[in-house]
Structure formats: C-alpha cells, structure tokens
Amino acid sequence: FEVKLNAGPTLVIEYKQESGYVPGSDVAPFSFHHIHHNYFGYRTFSSNGGEQIRVGTSTTSFTHGFNLIEYNYFEDERIEAEIISNKSWDNIYRFNTFIGNDGAMVIRHGQKCFVYGNYFDGKSGRNRSGGIRIINPNNTVFNNFLENIEGGKGNSKFPISIMDGLVDSPLNGYYPADNAIVAYNTVLNSYGPAIKLGVVNKDVKTPKVAPKNVIIIGNTIINSIGDNDSPYELTNEIGYDINFNKFKNHGIELRFLD
C-alpha cells in the first residue's frame, strides 16, 4: 500500500454494530483478524485521519477484538500523528518495523493491548517522528527497540509517551493510562526524554487527570545526541513505580536509575 493522498485510513478493521447497539455500553462481536507481512509506504494527508491502520472506532472501543498485527513494514508516512491507531481491546502489535515516519504507534482507545518486539527508526530530518503512545488503562509495552526518534525536538513526540486523561472524558476523548506497564524497551539516540509521563493534548482545554499505578521497569536508554540528559520526565501527581532502568548519556557509563 502506498501513495494514498486522500482522507481515511489505508486499512480499517470495523466492528459490526447490531440493532440497538449502545456506544460505550455494548460490545460488538469479536473479529480475530490477522494482518501480517504487508508493506505500507509513502502517504501524506493531514495531522488527523490519515492512519495506515485503524482498529475500531471510539463508538466500538469497548469491543474485545483479539486481532493480531505483526510483521508489517511502515515507511515514510508524513504529517499524520498516528501510524497505527488502536481503538478496541485485546489486540497484539508485534514484530512490526517503522522507518522514517512522522507519527507513532498509538493505543488511542481500548485496554489490555500488547505492543512488543517492534523496531522503530525515526530518522527523517523532519523532526516529527514518534514512537509509542499509550492512552487508556491496562496496556503493556515491552521489548521494543526505538532509535533516532526526532519528535522530542520541538514537536512533543517522544519514544514512549504515557498520556494524561480528561476529567469525565467522553467516549471519543482521553482516558488516563492507568496501570500501564513499560518494560525492557531500548531507546537509542532520541531527542527529549525517552519516556514521557503525563503527556497532554494541548488543543483540548478540559481539565486533565494523571494516570495511576504506572510501572516502568528494566528499560535501557542510551543517548549521544541532543542536550537533554533526562531519561524520563513526569508530572508530580502521577502514581508510578520506576525500577532497574539503565541510562547512558554522552559517554557516561551505563548506570541504573531508580
């Protein structure tokens, strides 16, 4: 798939809404789709509505999809903030490759999703690339390798971002990333903090609520670029547990951080 220039995701998983379906209360039937070994090449649109893959919608975001997305190659997607937009529960994203994109792998809605074993190289020279962004509770990100993520250089996109939610969030809003687990990831030579806790959407003025019970453990962060020697950045009100992470900056020996 490549050179799609009009609105709408390249590939969509839609869930069937039975008669009388109530968004946010009902769930649609499972889908069990397997998306694998595809190439998603150059496309550009705007900052919203041009994803390569979208799994569900906010209307069906409480659906347990049980979809598996693996061994896909994503390259040179421009402007759009979300390369993959997850919008349902119980999906797995593994062993995918992301090269020179402007966006991120985003758990936009849904819970109990796993993102692991993926490779990200954000080098493009456009200073827009992101890595993995977590919204909504009970999601797990582990054993990913991310390098050259450029979005922390003025565009508030980081290798791993854990977002605040909204107070009384609507279904299509932002729920806090409570109980997120970020474990055993490697971040190499990226701008800004490697792990940013408490990211907000500045365009949404509704009061924010910080995520709780976030676990960050066993990650390795190595940096020899930029002028920011902070491996992670967090807001004071977040409940978190940070243990056994390793950090090396500008030649300083690898050390454990608490």
Q: Where on the chain are the PLM-derived regions?
A:
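Glycine- and acidic/polar-rich repeat regions and solenoidal domains
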Residues: 1-257
